[in-house]
Amino acid sequence: MPRVKRGVTARARHKKVLVQAKGYRGRRKNVYRIAKQAVMKAGQYQYRDRRQRKRQFRSLWIARINAAARELGMKYSTFMNGLKKANIEVDRKVLADLAVFDQPAFAALAAQAKAQLGA
């Protein structure tokens, strides 16, 4: 069985990790053993935060819808309930955009929701 020299593969593996650690502070950017741990931890944060981003944006949309609904004299929950009863299926992302950039359209939706609740 021939002897396997691992210099090329080891160097490639080290380089791959050190390229990923580019921009890190201190020895995390140029010492392989430390950079490897930092890159692993960064990957864990990325994985976690990709999921958290979805939750945070939903919270932001709800806060914006709530603020706009309260300006029109409604709570968020009653506004959403009115929309559901009026069979208006608009997601929270679009509602938040309407609340920020197109107040008359949002007010029209709120009026429909109010009418549905009053009936």
From Swiss-Prot:
| Keywords assigned | Ribonucleoprotein, Ribosomal protein, RNA-binding, rRNA-binding
InterPro entries to which the protein is assigned, alphabetical: Ribosomal_bL20, RIBOSOMAL_L20_CS, Ribosomal_protein_bL20_C
One MF term in the entry's GO annotations? structural constituent of ribosome
- rRNA-binding as a keyword of this entry, yes or no, is yes
Q: Give any single GO term for biological process.
A: ribosomal large subunit assembly
Report the GO terms under cellular component. ribonucleoprotein complex; ribosome
Q: Which CDD domains match?
A: Ribosomal_L20
Q: What does this protein do?
A: Binds directly to 23S ribosomal RNA and is necessary for the in vitro assembly process of the 50S ribosomal subunit. It is not involved in the protein synthesizing functions of that subunit.
Q: Which family does it belong to?
A: Belongs to the bacterial ribosomal protein bL20 family.
Cite the HAMAP family for this sequence.
Ribosomal_bL20 (MF_00382)
What is the protein name given in its UniProt record?
Large ribosomal subunit protein bL20
